Amino acid sequence: MQSVDPQVVGVGKQFVEHYYGIFDSNRAGLTQIYQQQTTLTWEGKFLSGADAIVKHIVELPFQQTNRKINSIDCQQTYQPGIMITVTGTLIIDGEAKNQLKFVQVFNLASNNGSFLLINDFFRLVLD
């Protein structure tokens, strides 16, 4: 049985750590991650382009977020790129009662030795 390339997993985990570090400390700083060609589907709402995406994220109705990551799965894609699926719990405004399970999928495309975020999907997992 083949396994996933450890380098792919390493890049994926580094991206996730970097992304959530910015999301949880300064959402407006996500302009350095999202591109003009990036698309985001956030809870069924489709957004395109860095400006629209970051505006939506900055305007979310909570101030502070932290998260507990349950799993990070990475897989190399055809381009070559990396598909990353994250599951976890989102903790809103530091409140134990405000914990929501989520899944997020990132699609990174290779670009001259680095990676660009091309697609992002975010969905809460409601019971």
From Swiss-Prot:
The keyword Ribosomal protein is assigned to this record: no
High-level lineage: Eukaryota, Amoebozoa, Evosea, Eumycetozoa, Dictyostelia
Any single GO BP term: protein import into nucleus
Compartments reported by the entry: Cytoplasm, Cytosol; Nucleus outer membrane; Nucleus, Nuclear pore complex; Nucleus inner membrane
Role according to the record: Mediates the import of GDP-bound RAN from the cytoplasm into the nucleus which is essential for the function of RAN in cargo receptor-mediated nucleocytoplasmic transport. Thereby, plays indirectly a more general role in cargo receptor-mediated nucleocytoplasmic transport. Interacts with GDP-bound RAN in the cytosol, recruits it to the nuclear pore complex via its interaction with nucleoporins and promotes its nuclear import.
Any one Gene Ontology cellular component term annotated for this protein: nuclear outer membrane
GO molecular function: small GTPase binding; structural constituent of nuclear pore
Stretches assigned to the NTF2 domain: 11-124
UniProt-listed PANTHER family: NUCLEAR TRANSPORT FACTOR 2 (PTHR12612)
Predominant place of localization: cytoplasm
The protein's name in its UniProt record: Nuclear transport factor 2
UniProt xrefs under InterPro entries: NTF2, NTF2-like_dom_sf, NTF2_dom, Nuclear_transport_factor_2_euk
Pfam family, one: NTF2
PROSITE patterns: NTF2_DOMAIN
Keywords per UniProt: Cytoplasm, Membrane, mRNA transport, Nuclear pore complex, Nucleus, Protein transport, Translocation, Transport
